[in-house]
């Protein structure tokens, strides 16, 4: 079977210098009593990047040196010198001179790809200060990312219930003009999560849809922080398939980075040793490292959900409610079974992919997809990233997906010439 080599290109806000070349698997915070062990374990687990949110001076420079030595990318923050978190912030970066001092310190660190400037700015003065600091740092060090992350809709001020979250997220993107759009959402154990209902009525889906809309409008890569442990301590009975489902869910919406909150509570423990989900994350991180090259070439075209998603709604949810209908797809037909979601993603050459997700994080789900016409289906193999023929001349596809799992397939008309695709980064 012929293999076509298709170019893909770096992604990012055209108003910023920094561009994303590869799929990123990162984690918030560099914590651990033995930081050398921690960084080595994060590297072994398949993470490609560490983020130093809220880092002390000692932690920041210790981890920066270890990442340089061990070979792990870093988004740097030394809270004693710059940056902020919501309303609490440092005001030390007041001038271009101070920004230059920080950039000069970082310049020798080749594995440091960016600066963690602000965690969850939400008021307008915080958004403006975040923009100011990113602009100053970019002027001194334009090849590195000025990173910030938006606050989720359960923040208590800008919510879906009062109708103010969509406007907040737009202001975040318009005022800051970030190189990428990142959002965190940790749904297990908070309101709209239910033991029986799982995440069927979680506003996480509204936040993801709002992100997708803005990323499409501004041509921004979508980054998503997912929950990887029992953060809220409310008897959720947190299990790894919950994290797996959230990781795959973000990719239905076109995510180009998955941000673990947090590796020191899931991949490692606070001593820096291997943690409760080390083995599980090592497997799934390897899978995403194999899928990542293809995912970087794809844009989210549609996201379809079974009709049991978001059955409890309000008028103020309207802007984030799923509007894509299977009848709009040129690939899918019919309806989706319970707790099933499908992202339809296209590359710039017109090739079409389906990311099929079992949203049920407690049990296996048999998923039957119906196609419009006869199709040829290729699986994007999670072991090596290659496209392999899965089924020919089919009008339907039956999949068995374990709890919270997903599969990425490419679909073409059966009458077309068969070929696999490999994407090549054209810098």
Give the location of each predicted region.
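Glycan-processing catalytic domains of CAZymes
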Residues: 1-374, 379-420, 426-427
